From Swiss-Prot:
This is Soluble pyridine nucleotide transhydrogenase. HAMAP family: SthA (MF_00247). Its cofactor is FAD. Its EC number is 1.6.1.1. One of its GO terms (cellular component) is cytosol. Gene3D superfamilies: 3.30.390.30, FAD/NAD(P)-binding domain. FAD binds at residues 36-45. Belongs to the class-I pyridine nucleotide-disulfide oxidoreductase family. InterPro entries: Class-I_Pyr_Nuc-Dis_Oxidored, FAD/NAD-bd_sf, FAD/NAD-binding_dom, FAD/NAD-linked_Rdtase_dimer_sf, Pyr_nuc-diS_OxRdtase, Pyr_nucl-diS_OxRdtase_dimer, STH_gammaproteobact. It catalyses: NAD(+) + NADPH = NADH + NADP(+). Its main location: cytoplasm. One of its GO terms (biological process) is NADP metabolic process.
Length: 466
């Protein structure tokens, strides 16, 4: 028998955006319902995206570290692990994350509904359960935090047993010797690192003229060189004409006339917002061609009581930003406005091997803006900590205004880059004279540390001034 429930707010989706919104609402005293279509909370971030891919990457990087460090191994003793082996590690992390996040909802008395959500009208949502039954929920405010999914062109047979997207690759059951990755964005590059780290041949097909073009060009070039040096074959400015599944693999026919064959293919070219099936037509909302919703600065859609956060609104499509967006939407919902907003310079972390992380402007952007900047660099190979741990590939680059010494951008390539970047970000976010390169010269760092790279880079940059 169908039941009817009323809440202060309904949150559709339990990924980072949904969690941020739900926690923000209950902490302000709201009675909240959370609808999650999957069996467990956490969304795509926990189950198919950020968490599993980073867990896989970590496992592979530790294998590489062991095999390359003469302290641990020699030619007669190396570690070899299969994709299935490292998937076990990812599964353990996923289970830990799921239990932890379920605890958040339980402790804060969120009302959980496991089913598919669709709008009946602007304040009413139907929840359809796996057994075919349904309930009706009503609320004064609703948050759409349904995330995104891999884009699947209609002319690619994703039912073929050797053709995967970034969700289904976690179900890889055979041990490939050769993988084609179509799409050289963040996901494609991260999986190229993972597979190559397992000694799998990798063909990385890039539809653009360089890798990760949004990065500072030096960082992009460093990744390209590192891939090349480790045997990844990169094919730039290529598009597929046909993707042909065979009995023992996949053949990609490129528009340039070339053909590439491998054991399997990972299609990682684009994502689509999860808005189909939500019944948006029943409330007068319409997603764009990529399934994304348009919102204002408080994450309100065209309907002021319906909010949207996370991947379903597009850029920046980061788990970190999605959580903050959810918190901001919750504050706006309860108080009528939000007194916090996303920071202007959101850091990016790309978990290739080695990592890449950036915050602020690139050299190319500053040159186009005609900003008089200077560069300070530190090579990891010159840091005692990097030498001790045997991870001396990489560098830190600080861009600063040559007159005011204000930090304008920070770019890091190397192990722990995504952690290292936040030291510089903290100074960049200071107002007025607090944002200065000289902070790194005038403070004392622990020694030996990777953080010391900031002092080295700052001194290097200041020595360039005249």
């Amino acid at each position: 028998m169908q039941q009817h429930f009323h809440f202060d707010a309904i949150v559709i989706g339990s990924g980072p955006g949904g969690e941020g919104a739900a926690m923000g609402l209950v902490k302000q005293g709201a009675r909240v319902a959370v609808i999650e279509r999957y069996n467990n909370v956490g969304g795509g971030c926990t189950h198919w995206g950020t968490i599993p891919s980073k867990a896989l990457r970590h496992a592979v990087s530790r294998i590489i570290e062991f095999n390359q460090n003469p302290l641990y191994s020699d030619n007669a003793r190396t570690i070899k692990s299969s994709f299935a082996d490292i998937l076990n590690h990812a599964d353990r992390v996923i289970n830990q994350q799921t239990r932890m996040r379920q605890g958040f909802y339980d402790r804060n008395h969120c009302h959980m509904f496991s089913g598919d959500a669709s709008f009946i009208d602007a304040n009413t949502v139907n929840v359809r359960y796996a057994d075919g039954t349904s309930d009706t929920l009503q609320a004064d405010n609703i948050v759409i935090a349904t995330g995104s999914r891999p884009y699947r062109p209609v002319n690619v047979d994703f039912n073929h047993e050797r053709i995967y997207d970034s969700d289904t690759i976690l179900q890889l059951s055979h041990e490939p010797q050769h993988v084609i990755i179509y799409g050289a964005g963040v996901i494609g590059c991260e999986y190229a690192s993972i597979f190559r780290g397992l000694s799998v041949k990798v063909d990385l097909i890039n539809t653009r003229d360089r890798l990760l073009a949004f990065l500072d060009q030096e960082m992009s070039d460093a990744l390209s060189y590192h891939f090349w040096n480790n045997g990844v074959v990169i094919r730039h400015n290529e598009e597929f004409e046909q993707i042909e599944g065979t009995t023992d693999g996949v053949i990609v026919h490129l528009k340039s006339g070339k053909k590439v064959k491998a054991d399997c293919l990972l299609y990682a070219n684009g994502r689509t917002g999860n808005t189909s099936g939500l019944g948006l037509e029943n409330i007068g909302l319409e997603a764009d061609s990529r399934g994304l919703l348009k919102v204002n600065s408080m994450y309100q859609t065209a309907l002021s009581h319906v909010y949207a956060v996370g991947d379903v609104i597009g850029y920046p499509s980061l788990a970190s930003a999605a959580y903050d967006q959810g918190r901001i939407a919750a504050q706006a919902m309860i108080k009528g406005e939000a007194n916090v907003h996303l920071i202007e310079d959101i850091p990016t972390g790309i978990y290739t091997i080695p990592e890449i992380s950036s915050v602020g402007k690139t050299e190319q952007e500053l040159t186009a803006m005609k900003v008089p900047y200077e560069v300070g660099r530190a090579q990891f190979k010159h840091l005692a900590r990097a030498q001790i741990v045997g991870m001396d590939t990489g560098s830190l680059k600080i861009l600063f205004h040559r007159e005011t010494k204000q930090i304008l951008g920070i770019h890091c390539f190397g192990e722990r880059a995504a952690e290292i970047i936040h030291i510089g970000q903290a100074i960049m976010e200071q107002k007025g004279e607090g944002n200065t390169l000289e902070y790194f010269v005038n403070t004392t760092f622990n020694y030996p540390t990777m953080a010391e790279a900031y002092r080295v880079a700052a001194l290097n940059g200041l020595n360039r001034l005249f």
